[in-house]
Amino acid sequence: MRKGPFVGLLGVLAGALVAAPFAFAGGTITGKVTFSGKSEEKEFLFSKFPNPKFCPKNPHKELVKGEKRILPMIEVKDGGLKGAVVAVADIEDKAFIDSYKGTDVVAEFCEFLPYTGVVVKQKNFHVENHDADPEDPKSVKGVLHNPHSFEVLGASSSTVFNIALAEKDSKLDKPVVLRKDKQGSFFRLQCDQHEFMQGYYLPVSNPHFAVAKEDGTFEIKDVPAGKHKLVVFHPGSGKGMRTEVEVDVPEGGKADVKAALK
């Protein structure tokens, strides 16, 4: 049967629709976050905090030095800064925000994990206590942790939630309430029982973010082509103030970024 022009046109349109996702495929941002200084850490005596026999059992041995708990504030390897959060800041993705399930943090051997990450405004922040000490009658059912969260901007800090988790497997699930995120605030977590338990999280509004690896390198895939503003955040650099970097992402290609923090 002879095909008319309308049928042929439908075929062309169908082909165009199938090809569309590939035609508008984004690009990739790769790079390295560098730090001009040296590694820095804080020291805490276990004896000054609850559970001085349990907390030193942390399997991350680099965090335990005899009777002291080490909190790495800045970790530098070959000039690269571990744990920096890099995010595209000029895209608000409603679908991502609506579908975001929340930020998950665990308290494990007196450590909040992950140490750095992201949060989404008004979406939930989950903390689960994994700790119990069968050798301590007071902590058999659970090591008491008290996750206390803050919104921080410069010298300003305000409580978001402050909830005790007394037993193993106890959880909290609270929305991230931010009032100064447009001004550059970040979300801070600290245990009121164990000061060395800390975590820091950057507010984001799209899925285009990454946490720098041990050597400071990162990769963000599927970023819409065009010019974008990146923000780079690390709690130990510049008192947590964000550093901005401009990047031009090529269609289907890569843009390499060098972000230098001080």
Briefly describe each language-model feature range.
Residues M1-G4:
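Positively charged n-region of N-terminal signal peptides that target proteins for export
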Residues G8-A20:
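Bacterial N-terminal signal peptides
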Residues F24-K262:
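Extracytoplasmic copper-binding redox domains, predominantly the cupredoxin/blue-copper superfamily
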